[in-house]
Amino acid sequence: MNEEVREILGGLDFESTKDVAVPERLIDQVIGQDHAVEAIKKAAVQKRHVMLIGSPGTGKSMLAKAMAELLPKEELEDILVYPNPQDPNQPKIRLVPAGKGREIVEAYKEEAMKKAQARNFLIFTLVFLVIGYTVLTNPGNLIWGIIAAVLILMMSRYFIPREDRNVPKLLVDNSDKVTAPFEDATGAHAGALFGDVRHDPFQSGGLETPAHERVEAGAIHRAHKGVLYIDEINTLTIESQQKLLTALQDKKFPITGQSERSSGAMVRTEPVPCDFILVAAGNLDALMGMHPALRSRIEGYGYEVYMNDTMPDTPENRQKLVRFVAQEVVKDGKIPHFDKYAVAEIIKEARRRAGRRNHLTLRLRELGGLVRTAGDIAKSEGSDIVRLEHVLKAKKIAKTIEEQLADKYIERRKDYKLFITEGYEVGRVNGLAVIGESAGIVLPIIAEVTPSMSKSEGRVIATGRLQEIAREAVMNVSAIIKKYTGRDISNMDVHIQFVGTYEGVEGDSASISIATAVISAIEGIPVDQSVAMTGSLSVKGEVLPVGGVTQKIEAAIQAGLKKVIIPKDNIDDVLLDAEHEGKIEVIPVSRINEVLEHVLEDGKKKNRLMSKFKELELAAV
């Protein structure tokens, strides 16, 4: 095996993922979330609630399912609902051991059937006797005999109660469950979560459906003695969160009709047991939308866990990613196994997507999508194993919407020349930004400086949504401009345009781009348009690290730029694949004067400006 590939695979030697053992228990399949796994294990033993907060695709739902497997084995129960003769609108609830519920219902049905058969036999015997008596005594009155028989049948239907009305309904059936129940109630409406009573269109005349037969269990009741999982818990209404809190506290919750206009609203069962463990999940914004009392309940009687987005790039963790690929193949069941070179490419992609030096991404759902796409390509080509070329093809196909939009963005901007890739321009810079979380774009920035229209102070005038970001960046830049150029911009209006602004561009990574454009506009020094740049900026002129440098560099390459300036602290975060390697010169910088040195056009103005920088730096030393 190639030594580089062996190193990427963490020292593992295998021919394909078929040789890699996949753990049977779900909890052992969780990768890179050691803290969360430990919390889940403790919560399962002690029956505590858990809240998992983190990015999508980091294993929250998998941990919740794993918890159901870990719960101590105890006697599961079936829940039956019976009619209440004293108050038909308050059906009775009864608990029996798992499996007994079906037996009881079948026994009641059998008994009801026997009674119905006996009743029907008596009624039809009576009907034949009436008709027979009429024919024998007075054949001319046969029609009246038939009418009498029909009346007897109708009266028996309306006035003799049906035997099946007393048959109980099996509300929760756990007869086929070996482990504790797991209920995913993500996105469930109130009726699906707390139970409901169906509407009865025929409410009289003997045609009505008994109240207990219309009762439907909710997810909280089906999760009795198991796990209730709710992702994006903040999407629940406050009213639903209050009900959920009541169910958590009382461990039982009655079922009633959820719609005021339904006849089911009049029905309210006895409290139905719902002794479940709640596993709530969501992103950081989920905390803002949670009912304070509900969060307090989880915090006081359970664990709060923040999921990792990345894990250290160590041989042990790379071995875990090898196992992850094997797990995905086994779970999917429709794609071939991967050879070692294909797995190595998946691990390289995990490094690239981490966006952080010496780390591997833990957004494994997205990485799993790449695995499945590569498997589909191999399958369509008739290959019995996934090879390196299949993964490389998959990387081009399995692009996110943001990446596809970024490709179209760059393509269209090229057509209309919205960004320039050669020559020199005053006050114009090719900045770099990220759309979403995985797609880079070139963001042309144009600055113009004019005398202030206000007698009191100058203004920062920027486009649309980027007004706030631009203002903040310029305020930081103003200190640098005053210090190094000797100009006071308080009596100037600074106009900044983000050309072809794309929705979703955020952050201050355009700070050095704005600073360069403004300094170029003030000093009248042209900027090299073959250079793109990204980086945050301190008021002291230090270039600070930013996120998504790999994606931004790839966007610069795609746009046809020759150089890219990035913060020096980000140099180890650059993980270009073979397709982009060596196609652009990457220049790491640590101060704004280094940026200007690389991008401003040579000449007297530049020399004069750079000499000011040197003088001030020497004075500071």
Swiss-Prot record:
It comes from the Archaea. Its EC number is 3.4.21.-. SMART domains: AAA. GO terms for molecular function: ATP binding; ATP hydrolysis activity; ATP-dependent peptidase activity; serine-type endopeptidase activity. InterPro entries: AAA+_ATPase, Lon_arc, Lon_proteolytic, Lon_Prtase, LonB_AAA-LID, Mg_chelatse_chII-like_cat_dom, P-loop_NTPase, Ribosomal_Su5_D2-typ_SF. The chain crosses the membrane at residues 118-136, 142-160. Changing E506A: Slightly decreases proteolytic activity. GO terms for cellular component: plasma membrane. Residues 137-141 are extracellular. The active site is at S509, K552. ATP binds at G54, S55, P56, G57, T58, G59, K60, S61. Keywords: ATP-binding, Cell membrane, Hydrolase, Membrane, Nucleotide-binding, Protease, Serine protease, Transmembrane, Transmembrane helix. ATP-dependent serine protease that mediates the selective degradation of mutant and abnormal proteins as well as certain short-lived regulatory proteins. Degrades polypeptides processively. PANTHER family: ATP DEPENDENT LON PROTEASE FAMILY MEMBER (PTHR10046). NCBIfam families: lon_rel (TIGR00764). Belongs to the peptidase S16 family. Archaeal LonB subfamily. This is Archaeal Lon protease.
